[in-house]
From Swiss-Prot:
The active site is at E226 (proton donor), E381 (nucleophile). Pfam families: Cellulase (PF00150), Dockerin_1 (PF00404). The gene is celG. One of its GO terms (cellular component) is cellulosome. Residues 497-564 form the Dockerin domain. Residues 473-494 are annotated as: Disordered. It catalyses: Endohydrolysis of (1->4)-beta-D-glucosidic linkages in cellulose, lichenin and cereal beta-D-glucans. This is Endoglucanase G. It is an enzyme of class 3 (hydrolase). It comes from Acetivibrio thermocellus (strain ATCC 27405 / DSM 1237 / JCM 9322 / NBRC 103400 / NCIMB 10682 / NRRL B-4536 / VPI 7372). GO terms for molecular function: cellulase activity. GO terms for biological process: cellulose catabolic process. It comes from the Bacteria. Belongs to the glycosyl hydrolase 5 (cellulase A) family.
């Protein structure tokens, strides 16, 4: 029993520490702080085949959306003139369990050197009862808004509290609202840090990974948004061309991604590394390489090139797969895919179906990676206008393919101010486009009765969702981590059993997750690792509905200790 008390004391200490770290300076309550308690290191993910698993071997489905702004000149979410936490709460309640956050290398560099660039177009006021908007962004010492890094850290705390996980996307080298148009991850002049180099790009990502290595809110890094560029017709290979081959050239995206990924995984081997494709890939089966100029007017079989959306071409994986050695378990490939309202690609010219899209574009460009079990696919951007025509038809077909194959994805986008696609939110940043959301909703991870499933083992996804722990009942060890990470420490077996009454999943806490497991025990569907001794919370030698009532009363604080024997 001493051992159980020691475990319980450690858990209490960790809870207090978590509350201290994530409680906000203003507007915080004990309830809010308690909701943010998390062990910080139990939600890391890894891959096996084309699936993604939690550290206990339970399969997960990453179903999210994009919210841009940190990549832009404002250095903060667009829409921060409204209350960001309110928007995030709505996002969580709508079932988005992963938020892809575009950001610039320029902004990360300012954080890394300790001189965070300022934000603009952010409202921050804490003057109750008259005006309270983003009160945690307000700095009373300066009577002004906090800097970009402080605001980002606060937002990560909000995401943790709401059960939202985050994927960082290096959207552009410079802080630029049109920065995605630049082809590469290096070579761009910025207004605050000179020219972004490959080293700067890697160093800033490693710095951020190290900063958050003990906080599993950020679970993935999308190394570079949409590397692209066309080969052209000249003999000389263009400098602004992202290619995918076996060279060590600086513009070889495959080589750069491997180099960057290995550096990140040195500081945190548990994060997912998300790698996009390029725009063009040579027809290597015909002997063509990146040294082969394009042919004027050549199309179809006559062209030396396979074309795709920016960042969408992953044909190179079949010839030159990413190799991270023992940490290949962290690789996720990530195409982007759009409809005809963004650009009238040739595969949209016919009366297309899911099968024609697969035959003409999807399968050989990226879907084969999932189909052949090479690695998971996460479609980092997809979305568009609800036009009632071809674009909406494409969006529905891709949605159906995502659902049928449980493809991971992040929808583009939350923002209403994306010109190519529009957003899930209206211009007031509070009204949802219900028709577009209805199209997306079936592709969000949820139970059969419509409860959204988060990626945090303890914190439910918003007010209408459940946690991963509640969904699976208790961690399962059927597929142990493939990454070199420490396994969870649990009480060792001894001749005298040590346990905490009510701690049915043996994680050191007594909470609603245990109540859910107890319910499964009562209906004869117990998890294999459930601690039946801990479930007998009235110590009568049986586990039945009486124990459920007792544990529920304990969690509601109607009784103050377990076992409850009266």
């Amino acid at each position: 029993m001493k051992k159980a008390k020691a475990i319980f004391s450690l858990v209490v200490a960790l809870m207090v520490l978590a509350i201290f770290c994530f409680a906000q300076n203003t507007g915080s309550t004990a309830t809010t702080a308690a909701a943010a308690v998390d062990s910080n290191n139990d939600d890391w993910l890894h891959c096996k085949g084309n699936k993604i698993y939690d550290m206990y071997g339970n399969e997960v489905w990453l179903t999210g959306a994009n919210w841009f702004g940190f990549n832009c000149s404002e250095n903060c979410f667009h829409g921060a003139w409204y209350d960001v936490k309110t928007i995030l709460t709505s996002i969580a309640d709508r079932g988005i369990n992963l938020l892809r956050i575009p950001i610039s290398t320029e902004l990360l560099y300012s954080w890394m050197i300790g001189k965070p660039n300022p934000v603009s177009s952010v409202t921050a006021s804490n003057n109750p009862p008259y005006h309270v908007v983003n009160p945690d962004f307000y700095d009373p010492e300066t009577d002004d808004v906090k800097n970009s890094m402080e605001i980002f850290d606060i937002i990560m705390g909000y995401c943790k509290e709401l059960g939202i996980k985050v994927m960082i996307d290096i959207h552009s080298p410079d802080a630029n609202n049109s920065g995605h148009n630049y082809e590469l991850w290096y070579g761009k002049e910025t207004s605050t840090c000179g020219v972004v180099t490959t080293k700067m790009w890697i160093d800033t990502l490693v710095w951020l990974a190290d900063k958050y290595k003990n906080d599993d809110t950020i679970i993935a890094f999308d190394l570079k948004n949409e590397p692209h560029g066309k080969r052209g017709y000249t003999a000389e290979v263009p400098k602004l061309l992202a290619k995918w081959d076996n060279s060590t050239d600086e513009n070889n995206w495959k080589y750069a991604a491997e180099t960057c990924a290995k550096a990140i995984l040195e500081v945190n081997p548990k994060v997912l590394i998300v790698i996009e494709g390029v725009e063009q890939y040579p027809k290597t089966e015909k002997g063509y390489t990146y040294d082969t100029p394009d042919i004027w007017g050549a199309t179809g079989d006559a062209s030396p090139w396979y074309s795709a959306w920016w960042g969408g071409n992953l044909r190179g994986v079949k010839d030159y797969p990413i190799d991270l050695g023992p940490l290949n378990s962290q690789i996720v490939y990530s195409p982007h895919d759009y409809g005809p309202s963004v650009y009238a690609q040739p595969w949209f010219e016919k009366d297309f179906t899911m099968q024609t899209l697969l035959d003409d574009y999807w399968y050989d460009t990226w879907a084969y990676i999932h189909d052949q079990g090479i690695a998971p696919i996460l479609i980092g951007e997809w979305g568009g206008h609800m036009d009632g025509g071809k674009n909406q038809k494409w969006m529905t077909l891709l949605r159906d393919y995502i659902v049928q194959n449980r493809i991971h994805h992040t929808f583009w986008c939350i923002n209403p101010n994306s010109g190519d696609t529009g957003g899930l939110l209206g211009n007031d940043w509070s009204t949802w486009d219900e028709a577009k959301y209805a199209l997306l909703k079936p592709a969000l991870w949820q139970t059969k009765d419509g409860k959204f499933i988060g990626l945090d083992h303890k914190i439910p996804l918003g007010s209408k969702g459940i946690s991963l722990g509640e969904y699976y009942g208790t961690p399962q060890a059927s597929d142990p981590p493939a990454t070199p990470t420490a396994t969870p420490t649990k009480p060792a077996a001894s001749s005298t059993p040590s346990f905490i009454y009510g701690d049915i999943n043996s994680d050191g806490n007594v909470n609603s997750t245990d109540l859910g497991i107890l319910k499964r025990i009562i209906v004869k569907n117990p998890p294999a690792s459930a601690n039946m001794d801990a479930a007998d919370v009235n110590a009568d030698g049986k586990v039945n509905s009486t124990d459920y009532t007792v544990l529920k009363r304990y969690l509601l604080r109607s009784i103050d200790k377990l076992p409850h024997t009266t």
